[in-house]
Amino acid sequence: MKGFPKALHTRRIYTGESLRYLRNPNAPESQATIPVASPDQALFEALIMERVMAGQGFLAHPLGVSHVRILADGQLAVHLDAPERDMRHGPLDETMAQHLLPCGEPGEWFCGVAGLRVVAVEGSSLTIGMAGTTARLILIAHTGWTKWLARKKKSAIALGELPLWEAPGITAGELESIPPQIRRLAWLGSGLLRRIALFHNVGNAYWVKGWTMGDHWKIEMFIHPDLDPGHDNFVDWLTLPPYGLSLQSEYRSCTCNRSVGHLRGCWQELTHRDDPQAGVLQLRFHMSDVGIRWGRRLADSGARSSWLSRTGLS
């Protein structure tokens, strides 16, 4: 780390970017802070983040993403975790990618990210975009995408569904499925995706899930009951200027001082510092012991022993 700018080292905690990438001339110290996405880009990233948080398998990192890279053009590269070693399904079926591709019956839409379109496939890189916009995102996997995409298309057609990720424009059903609240919360969802490594690098949560409801983006983090929940440290990093999100605490209910582990927990709500009407981030720190079996499955997915130890699963 000698000679490495402190600002870039701090950014790395949020994004998970490698030292090698941050030493690249395209990521100088002047770009150490995390840039804000354009409106279309932010909405697309928020829709992706909403699906990522809706469900995950046993993957090496919370939410199934090892790190993100913010590219020179302001777009995002998202590096996916590989699935468990003994999974019998296709190698991408158990990654977070399984939740993203939109499909539906003619005239309606029912699954995946509305408006997502495949733009380009190149080896292990899949470029996706939002129809009718310049928003782009690159998914980097552990294997190629071509066969998996062909299999997904064949499966959709066999079920009488349309592989909407190939459609030329966004359908009426997809447009109707994008609720007004996700548009208001786009800045928050995008900001969380661009800082997704915080869930692995800061705090003690072994499992993370989230969803949107009204003007709230809700995140639940599961923590071993024998550990310090570490919620203050997590919130401090999440809101640290200029790297974190522009959030301030509005409400807090904490029972972490109780002696019984499973009854301990914390509930916090944060709003935008400059615009409290821009939506609420609700953080729930939930104490729950899932046993050593979970630790073994996460280890089989490539989770590092140091992280498993920190989260109480080894």
Put a short name on every predicted segment.
Residues 110, 115-116:
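Phosphate/adenylate-binding glycine loop and adjacent helical scaffold
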Residues 46, 72-98, 102, 216:
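Long, low-hydrophobicity ectodomains and other hydrophilic envelope-associated domains
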